[in-house]
Design a protein with these regions (language model features):
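Signature of Gram-negative outer-membrane beta-barrel scaffolds
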Residues: 303, 425, 429, 436, ...
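Membrane-embedded beta-barrel scaffold of Gram-negative outer-membrane proteins
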Residues: 385-391, 395-406, 456-457, 468-472, ...
Length: 875
């Protein structure tokens, strides 16, 4: 398939060029004076006309109208894009692993523990100048291009000095002013910083930094006194005791400013943005698991849960720019810190254990940090245009004191602490990832006679990601003086108190690397990619534009698990995948009218497994409360992409488009949900044999000025904007196909038909995506109001562990939002006020399994409606 597609693209380019040459060299008739005047795309916006690809563009005005708070939310307004878990973007139904996110053209590191794709909820809207969503591949972009590439563009230096300050408050019907779960934590939690309360216990740092917490000098362990000092050094009540408090309002603060000025050496500019957000969200819902039962399903566990989360986010951006003649150099520095403080109670009934009732209590703290520095430049050197950029980025994720403890409930309601296995977990995990990248692009206008215009682009790119993730797990167990009658009913802070530790009533055990928590306590992962490309973009004939390119990529992707106490020793497991690809791409644009054009695209691309999917380290997904574990035997996915789109532009920012697309996928990656011995779902990944995906997109946006004789109506411009995407997919399975699984640490190759029958939809793909915006704007009054409707149809969230069991299905449903903005002046100062109402339909989150007329909710919860007020001033 690869060789065939490449041959077709090259042959097509040769034929097109030859045809153009013949047409251009045919001599005119004698005595005839021919003067050709061509107006090409006069009504087509510059940003659309400048690209040869099928693309969407998200402007600052679009984000302001929708009132979206971050990049992930804003992108859901774009045709064919859906959002999963509030932070991961799916393009045309393809998971986040197939959608590359860039910042000013450079790749980004991710702070997610087992994931290489960055969650886009980290990027506040205030730092963005716009976003390009390119849906057809071009050779100047990375070859990891399944659904598309999302290029976030940060704000640049201003033409004139400004200072803008904004504040906001908000809340939701499930959380604000209600009595909800939380825990004390530390005194500086409200700032998103821990004051040292959650630091790795001093006893561990002093006595067991490079060895497990084990008593016994014969095994290199600790003395009894050292062991008890370690156990006593764990923070107790501030992190263990859950309580209920009345929830406050959410708060927002933004400040930004910039200035540019001329010097003898050129024009200099600077900009700075600082943002702080503090919000609370409660989820109350149901989590059920199932087992097969006479061709249908039966309930295995039935749990209700209540979770409350406090999210505190800081972000800062600084930019410097220098321009002189045909030279421009720009520096961008970005810092983002996002902290989540979570408390959760789960009341679980296990049907298989005689309806035994267990309460699980969780307290968690997650810190995610992104730091990035980028230096870039553009220069005109004679007939050549040189563009370059270098980026260094670092992300870190710390999860200290992930606390889980369980109590059993008797028929009379008495609580009994469960002290076996992993029922009293305390976990510490740290992730660090570094990324370095460099890009050089050269463009040259070719002096050729057989085409009207032609530009040659060549370039090279390099990228290296390196990641280290470590995790230590501890549990409390019965000591030699344990008396269940006296101690099993104690509150958690009394149960694990210094007194009980000193008296050998309770003991601390380390589980790091044990079978109870996963064998990979430490893993390293890396990806290094080197690439070069050549691309020609030309006006082949009047009104006909073609772009063809080839990209060569070579990559090494490595994952290895290490002994956390002897990291320099030989790896426990190591696997490196080295692959080379030649990736062709071609697009053709026919501008057959001054306001209309047709685009066609054909390309081959790839998708690499993410670290989350490769690393054999267990990780609890806090969104679903499931354990995830990677499969180090995953392989790359390859794509053949075909696109076509018709575009009609009425005016600036007003258009109608219709498109169709087809993708053939070899070895797509799917998520598999396996029911564990404890009745809980565990999730891993595998390569399905193949899949086809195809669909269509339509979008329309227009502003109307009405003449009704009614002043209130006639003084406003009325907006109608809608887009709809239909996508369908089919997994393809043949007899003899096998898959590779790594569920128990030993790879197996079962027949693919044990898990797939063929014809199933791809995991994460929704058949229907729709967005509707209805609103008005009044330039005189400075007001703008918009209703936003978003609909996402059902999608498979994870495959079941057997073809006889139904898949897990998510039902996002329809949401209706309302946003109102108005400008006004106070003593000559310009202010903007805003009001936002979200999820007016009260749509809840639903995930379920259904069979035999029965439905079981695997992860469903209430979301509620949210409301906010904002005020900003410009100085």
């Amino acid at each position: 398939m690869t060789r065939t597609l490449r041959t077709l693209l090259l042959a097509g380019a040769a034929l097109t060029t030859a045809h153009s040459a013949l047409a251009q060299t045919a001599p005119p008739s004698e005595g005839t004076e021919v003067e050709e005047i061509i107006v090409s795309g006069r009504f087509i916006p510059d940003v659309i006309r400048d690209t040869a690809e099928v693309a969407n563009f998200l402007s600052v005005e679009d984000v302001q109208r929708a009132g979206d708070d971050n990049a992930a939310q804003a992108l859901t307004r774009i045709t064919g894009i859906s959002l999963v878990s509030g932070k991961f973007v799916y393009v045309r139904g393809l998971g986040e692993r197939y959608s590359q996110a860039l910042l000013n053209g450079s790749p980004l590191p991710s702070p997610e523990p087992l994931q290489r794709v960055i969650p886009l909820d980290l990027f506040p809207a205030s730092i963005l100048a716009g976003t390009v969503i390119q849906k057809t591949f071009s050779a100047n972009y990375p070859g990891e291009f399944g659904g598309g590439v999302i290029d976030l563009q940060t704000v640049g230096t201003p033409d004139e000095a400004f200072l803008k300050v904004g504040v906001g408050i908000g809340g939701d019907t499930e959380t604000t002013a209600e009595s909800r779960l939380t825990y004390y934590g530390s005194e500086t939690d409200w700032l998103g910083f821990d004051d040292g309360t959650r630091k790795l216990p001093v006893g561990v740092r002093q006595f067991a930094a490079s060895r497990p917490v084990v008593v016994g000098s014969a095994t290199g362990g600790l003395t009894t006194d050292q062991y008890k000092a370690v156990a006593r050094s764990f923070t107790n009540a501030p992190l263990n005791v859950l309580q209920r408090d009345k929830m406050p309002l959410n708060g927002i603060f933004d400040i930004s400013g910039g200035q540019s000025f001329d010097t003898d050496y050129g024009r200099l500019g600077a900009i700075g943005v600082l943002s702080y957000r503090n919000g609370w969200q409660t989820r109350k819902g149901v989590r059920q698991t199932t087992v097969p039962d006479s061709g249908g399903l039966a309930l295995a566990t039935d749990a209700t849960f209540e979770a409350n989360q406090n999210d505190i986010a800081w972000s800062g951006l600084g930019g410097l720019a220098w321009e002189s003649g045909d030279n421009e150099v720009r520096y961008t520095g970005l810092w983002i810190r996002s902290t989540s403080k979570r408390a959760r109670i789960t009341s679980n009934t296990a049907q298989s254990q005689g309806n035994a009732n267990v309460n699980a209590y969780n307290s968690e703290w997650y810190e995610r940090v992104l730091q990035l520095s980028q230096l870039s430049g553009k220069h005109l050197i004679g007939d050549w245009e040189l563009a370059w950029r270098g980026t260094y980025g670092r992300t870190a994720r710390q999860a200290p004191y992930e606390r889980l403890y369980r109590y059993g409930l008797s028929a009379t309601g008495a609580s009994t602490a469960l002290l076996s296995g992993a029922n009293q977990l305390v976990s510490f995990s740290d992730l660090d990832e570094n990324i370095g990248s460099a890009n050089v692009d050269l463009a040259y206008d070719l002096p050729v006679d057989f085409v009207r215009q032609a530009q040659l682009k060549v370039g090279a790119a390099w990228q290296r990601n390196s990641r280290t993730s470590v995790r230590r797990d501890f549990t409390y167990d019965q000591g030699r003086n344990w008396d269940p009658v006296r101690y099993a009913g104690q509150r958690i802070d009394y149960l694990v108190s210094d007194r009980n530790i000193n008296d050998d009533i309770i003991l601390l055990r380390e589980l790091t690397g044990s079978s109870l928590t996963g064998d990979a306590a430490m893993y390293d992962a890396g990806l290094e990619v080197a690439a070069a490309y050549v691309q020609v973009d030309s006006e082949i004939r009047p009104l006909l534009r073609g772009s063809i390119g080839l990209r060569y990529e070579t990559a090494d992707q490595t994952v290895k698990t290490l002994d956390i106490f002897s990291p320099s020793a030989a790896p426990i497991f190591s696997r490196t995948v080295s692959k080379d690809y030649v990736l062709p791409a071609a697009t053709l644009t026919w501008n057959f009218a001054e306001d209309q054009q047709l685009r066609f695209g054909l390309s081959q691309t790839i998708g690499r497994p993410q670290f989350r999917e490769l690393a054999p380290q267990r990780y609890r997904d806090t969104e679903t409360d499931r354990i995830l574990s990677g499969n180090p035997y995953l392989e790359d996915t390859t794509f053949v992409n075909v696109d076509a789109r018709y575009e009609h532009y009425f005016s600036k920012g007003q258009y109608f488009t219709f498109g169709a697309f087809y993708k053939n996928m070899e070895k797509p990656i799917e998520a598999l949900a396996v029911l564990g011995s404890d009745g809980a779902f565990r999730q891993t990944f595998y390569n399905a044999p193949a899949a086809d995906i195809y669909g269509g997109e339509v979008e329309f946006k227009k502003l109307f000025e009405l003449e009704t004789g009614t002043t209130w109506v006639d003084n406003r411009r009325w907006l109608v904007s809608l887009n709809y995407t239909y996508t369908t997919s089919q997994l393809k399975v043949s007899d003899g196909d096998t898959i590779i699984l790594d569920i128990t640490g030993v790879p197996t190759t079962p027949p693919a038909r044990d898990y797939l029958t063929g014809g199933e939809k791809l995991q994460g793909q929704s058949d229907h995506l729709a967005n509707l915006q209805l609103g008005f704007e009044n330039d005189e009054a400075g007001s703008q109001a918009t209703f936003l409707v978003t609909y996402t149809s059902e999608r498979v969230s994870a495959r079941s562990s057997s073809v006889d069991l139904p898949d897990l299905v998510q039902k996002p449903g329809m949401r209706v939002d309302f946003v109102y903005r108005r400008n006004f002046e106070i003593q000559g100062r310009e202010f903007t006020g805003s009001f936002e109402a979200r999820n007016l339909t009260g749509t809840d989150a639903e995930e379920y399994q259904a069979a035999g007329g029965k439905r079981f909710d695997t992860n469903s919860f209430d979301i509620g409606q949210s409301f906010s007020l904002g005020l900003s001033a410009r100085f």
